[in-house]
Structure formats: C-alpha cells, structure tokens
C-alpha cells in the first residue's frame, strides 16, 4: 500500500454544506418569520402553500447528508434489484419469499386504487402469492408492539434514574425514524446521547421472522425477506451494520410496487379476491393474523408518545391525560395530571422546521428545566370525566415538547403517513395535507386496534431466541457547527 494512502483516507463521508446542494428559485412567497431567539415562527397554518420541488427526501437522502457508499446502498435496495435477485433465487427449490408490509403502505395502496383496506390487503397477498410464489406475508404490528414496549420500559427507567440522581431533565428522543436518526448522527452528534436506543418495527419484525424460522430449523439462507415501507430512508436503516442480522434483504415502497406492476404489465386489481383465509395461510407458524395485521392507538407512526403516557396513567389511577396542540399541526403533547401535578409528558414532533427549533432548544441551553404553571392548570381543570380535548381547551395551554420526558420525532411533515415512498403524488401542499388526514382517518376506522403494553412483554418472551432490539449509533464529529436557520433559509 502506498505511504500516501492511510486507513483514514477511506472514510468517504461528504460533510453537509450550509447551503442546500439542490437549491430552488422562490418567487412571490412569504418570507419565513424568525423571532429574536432565532426560532422559526410556524404558529399559523396557511390556507394554501406554493408548489415546491424540493422534498424532505432531497434534504435527508442527498449526497450532502449521506456518504457515497450509502448512495450505493440506496441503489441496491430497489424493485429492480428485487426482481433480479428473486428471479434467480426462485429457481432454487429450497428458497422461499417472505414479505412484510407496514400499515402506512397498506393504506396508501388502498387509497390509490380506491379499495377498502381489506380488499387491498387481499389483493397484495394474492399478487405476491401468485406471481412470486410468496410463502409468508405479515404486517409489522408485532414488531411495533415490541418496539413500543421496550421504548416505554426504557423511558420509565430513565425518568426514575433522573429523579433519583437529579440529572439533566432534557427529553429522550426517538430513533425509530431513520431520516431523523441519520440527520442527528451526521449533523448533530451532541444529541446522540439523547436518542432512545430501540429499533424500529421494520427491524424488529425482521428479527422476529428470523427467530421464527430458526426455531423451525430453517436456515437464514433459505428465505428472502422483502419489506414494504413508507419512505426511502428505510432502505438505509436496513443497511446499517447492526441491522444486517435482522434478515431483511430488500426494502421497497408503494411507489415502487406500482412501477413494478407497470413493468410487469400487470393490473393490481386483477388480483382482487374475497379469500380472507389468506390472512391465516400466509402467516408464519405462531403468528396470529389478528395481531400482526392490526395496529394500535396513538397515531399512525406507532403512537410511542401516547403509549408511554398511557402506561404511566395505568400506574396512577385517577390521573387524567390531556392532549395539547402545538404552534402548528405537527406538534402534539400528551400530558398526564395527577393531584394537580404533571407526572408524565411525551410529545410528537414532525417536519424539518420543527426539528430545527428542537435542535436549537436542546443545544443552546434554552431547553433547561423550568417550572410549569400548575396553578393555572389547577384553576382551569374540568371534571374528572372530561375527555382529553376538553381538558386541553380548559387549560388553555400550548404543547411544550422541549420539556417532555420523551419526544417522538418524525422527519416528514405530517409524519409517516406522508412518507416519500407513499402514493401521495399531490403537488399542492394543501391537497397533500388533506390526503394525509384522510389516511389517518382510515387508519382509525379500518384497522383493528390491539394493546401493545399488554402484548409486548408476552411477544418478546415467546420469541424463539433473543431479539436484536438496539442500534449502534455512529455520530460523526463536526469540525464546524452548522447554522440550521441558515440552512433552512435556502429552502
């Protein structure tokens, strides 16, 4: 090896630039309002936003934020690669196909093709069974249940430790959104210690599938696992070094499903069937279709924040949960009150602009602990039977995610139901938002709901082998502190 070439030269990380590498010309739009603290003011919801050509995936998955080697990984996770690889593997008698699909993808396909969720599920199962000889097809709820259960367990333990030691009260941050995880590791490594180390439903589902087959003496090489996910960053998640043992071979999105059908000259609706026995016949041994095809309360991204507060509420009979909306629709706080005290709080926060403010709050020191106005809450409390929204209105308070115990962060505005890989082709921002609202409504109406807090420990205990539940974070040291407001102003 040449003396001029060292091991350190092999790191091909491309440091993010202050200016976006994919700029756009904006004319006639309103300027962003930045207050005296350097925070974006997003207190109002515009009636209609201008059409834009830069998406979140441009920001989080371009060469400004990922390495060139990761770009290769993205290209290796596509429907074309799946068709090529499975075309070869399917010729081997000892190989079989397993498909896992997230609830967001199922709802997106149902909405796109104008079908009920059940009809779309059966159509998708029938398509993969008949065209690719798929042996098993599962929903990702079992993986999500375990992910939620471990998350809640860790938040509660962390909070007890902080109360006993008087440690810093900054919130824990979720790591289940790969877009936010990548962004944090490579631009804000000082936030990495705040990340709660629990894998996403995608990866835990893969680990569960592998454990199931190992218990049946089926070698890892005998099956090919295709995962259908709502965003392209899920491809990078499956390619993380610690994720390779989870047994996911390829990740594609609903957009790629539609493209694949077009390339195969197939009509999705031609696979319509009323054979509901597919739910059971395509479930692996020990997998209850009433569970893995279900969902849970708390939101379409998993409901981690809601489920944590619910878990604490069960430990404190008589406590009341209130739901507080933030400055914009992408911020929500679940606050638990008991004897006029806030005993637990968790928030949902989505979108790059809200993430900018979150990072600024948590890194500038302005996110230090402050006393909440409990007196105001005490005076304005309604009766114990008031529902969450009535209580939120009565307190006249605004969500304060920066002082929560835990923040469920999602990179996409509108969260996972607005993932870049979904079939939400509306360019008009208002119509796109309306589509997300429609999908969220369908999620609550068409999916059966299960209790992850009860089922989580049981599923983990029933697993045939210990599951891989944690990431190995890889923060990148930054030579120069990035000015997030400057970055945002180029959008």
UniProtKB/Swiss-Prot annotation:
Cellular location(s): Cytoplasm; Nucleus
Keywords: 4Fe-4S, Cytoplasm, Iron, Iron-sulfur, Metal-binding, Nucleus
SUPFAM superfamilies in alphabetical order: Fe-only hydrogenase
Coiled coil: none
Gene Ontology MF term list: 4 iron, 4 sulfur cluster binding; iron-sulfur cluster binding; metal ion binding
Binding site residues for [4Fe-4S] cluster 2: 177, 231, 412, 416
Similarity field: Belongs to the NARF family.
Name of this chain's protein: Cytosolic Fe-S cluster assembly factor NAR1
UniProt source species: Saccharomyces cerevisiae (strain ATCC 204508 / S288c)
Gene (UniProt): NAR1
């Amino acid at each position: 090896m040449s003396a001029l070439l060292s091991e350190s030269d092999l790191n091909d990380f491309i440091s993010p630039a202050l200016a976006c590498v994919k700029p756009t010309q904006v004319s006639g739009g309103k300027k962003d309002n930045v207050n005296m603290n350097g925070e974006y003011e997003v207190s109002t919801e515009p009636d209609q936003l201008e059409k834009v050509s830069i998406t979140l995936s441009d920001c989080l998955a371009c060469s400004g934020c990922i390495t060139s080697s990761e770009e290769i990984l993205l290209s290796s996770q596509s429907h074309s690669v799946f068709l090529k690889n499975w075309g070869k593997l399917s010729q081997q008698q000892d190989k079989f196909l397993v498909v896992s699909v997230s609830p967001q993808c199922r709802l997106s396909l149902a909405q796109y093709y104008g079908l009920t969720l059940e009809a779309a599920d059966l159509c998708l199962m029938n398509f993969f069974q008949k065209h690719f000889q798929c042996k098993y097809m599962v929903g990702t709820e079992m993986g999500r249940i375990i992910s939620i259960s471990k998350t809640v367990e860790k938040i509660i333990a962390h909070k007890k430790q902080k109360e006993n030691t008087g440690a810093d009260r900054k919130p824990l941050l979720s790591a289940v959104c790969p877009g936010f995880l990548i962004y944090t590791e490579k631009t804000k490594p000082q936030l990495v210690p705040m990340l709660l180390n629990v894998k996403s439903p995608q990866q835990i589902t893969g680990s569960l599938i592998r454990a199931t087959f190992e218990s049946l003496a089926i070698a890892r090489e005998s099956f090919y696992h295709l995962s259908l996910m709502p965003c392209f960053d899920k491809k990078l998640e499956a390619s993380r070094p610690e994720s390779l043992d989870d047994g996911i071979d390829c990740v594609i999105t609903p957009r790629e499903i539609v493209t694949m059908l077009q390339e195969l000259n197939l009509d999705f609706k031609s696979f319509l069937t009323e054979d509901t026995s597919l739910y059971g016949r395509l479930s692996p041994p020990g997998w209850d279709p009433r569970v893995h095809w279900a969902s849970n309360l708390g939101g379409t991204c998993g409901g981690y924040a809601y489920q944590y507060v619910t878990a604490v509420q069960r430990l404190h009979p008589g406590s009341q949960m209130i739901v507080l909306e933030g400055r914009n629709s992408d911020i929500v706080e679940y606050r638990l009150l008991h004897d006029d005290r806030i005993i637990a709080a968790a928030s949902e926060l989505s979108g790059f602009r809200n993430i900018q403010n979150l990072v600024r709050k948590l890194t500038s020191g302005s996110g230090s602990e402050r006393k909440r106005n409990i007196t105001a809450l005490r005076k304005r409390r309604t009766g114990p039977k008031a529902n969450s929204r009535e209580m939120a209105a009565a307190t006249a308070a605004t969500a304060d995610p920066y002082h929560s115990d835990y923040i469920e962060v999602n990179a996409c505005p509108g969260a996972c139901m607005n993932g870049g890989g979904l079939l939400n082709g509306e360019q008009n921002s208002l119509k796109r938002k309306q589509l997300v609202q429609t999908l969220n409504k369908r999620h609550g109406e068409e999916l059966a709901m299960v209790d992850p807090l009860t089922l989580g420990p049981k599923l983990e205990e029933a697993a045939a082998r210990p599951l891989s539940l944690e990431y190995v974070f890889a923060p990148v040291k930054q030579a120069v502190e990035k000015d997030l407001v400057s970055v945002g102003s180029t959008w």
